[in-house]
A protein has these predicted regions:
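Beta-rich carbohydrate-recognition modules and glycan-binding surfaces
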Residues: 1-196
Length: 196
């Protein structure tokens, strides 16, 4: 017996029942976070966390908190990206639970609702195949000062400092990153999921 979706919010894995994710009615979207928690907890039962270049001696300053933008709940990533000491990033990171990987077949990319300040940001994917902290698969997007839904196909992600092809079935972490140049980051993140 294989994986089956039993309706809204339930995934049947042989021997287990996981209330780990919500599916939209059309089942074309697997929701990782819908921002209904009011805190840093995601809909996929993992906490969002802030990662900055301080882990490598950088001095960028970042904040990550639940918030609201234009009447919608969001995760608010703010801060100053600075380049001193070989730094240059702040990141909202979400680890992907194994229960999501069990049902990932057939999904073709990441859907992201964002409201920004007109700056460019990156979406980074890390898999279990990457061991070095700077390795990832990356795609750049511009976040305009209005809510928009971005659909970023897995096929468009570029490997960064790795020769391995992206294996989505080994996805470990999703990172929404302000990176690479000195600027003020101000990004609201709404619903995050995978699309077919």
């Amino acid at each position: 017996m294989g994986l089956r979706f039993l309706g809204r919010g339930l995934l049947l894995v042989p021997g287990y029942l996981y209330p780990v994710m919500q599916l939209m009615a059309d089942q074309d979207m697997l929701i990782l976070d819908d921002r209904k928690s009011g805190d840093l907890q995601s809909a996929s039962d993992r906490q969002w966390h802030l990662v900055t270049d301080g882990v490598m001696g950088g001095v960028s300053d970042g904040r990550l908190a639940p918030g609201e933008m234009a009447g919608r709940p969001c995760l608010h990533l703010q801060g100053e990206v600075r380049l001193e000491n070989n730094g240059g990033f702040i990141q909202a990171a979400l680890d992907v639970p194994d229960t999501v990987l069990a049902g990932i077949t057939g999904y073709t990319g990441v859907s992201l609702e964002v409201y920004g300040n007109g700056e460019q940001y990156n979406l980074h994917l890390r898999t279990r195949d990457l061991w070095l902290p700077w390795q990832s698969y990356r795609m750049t997007f511009r976040a305009t000062p209005q809510w928009q839904t971005l659909r970023l196909p897995f096929a468009g992600f570029e490997p960064y400092r790795t020769g391995r092809a992206l294996d989505v079935g080994r996805l470990k972490r999703i990172g929404i990153v302000a990176i690479g140049r000195a600027f003020n980051a101000d990004l609201c993140i709404g619903k995050v999921g995978l699309f077919r």
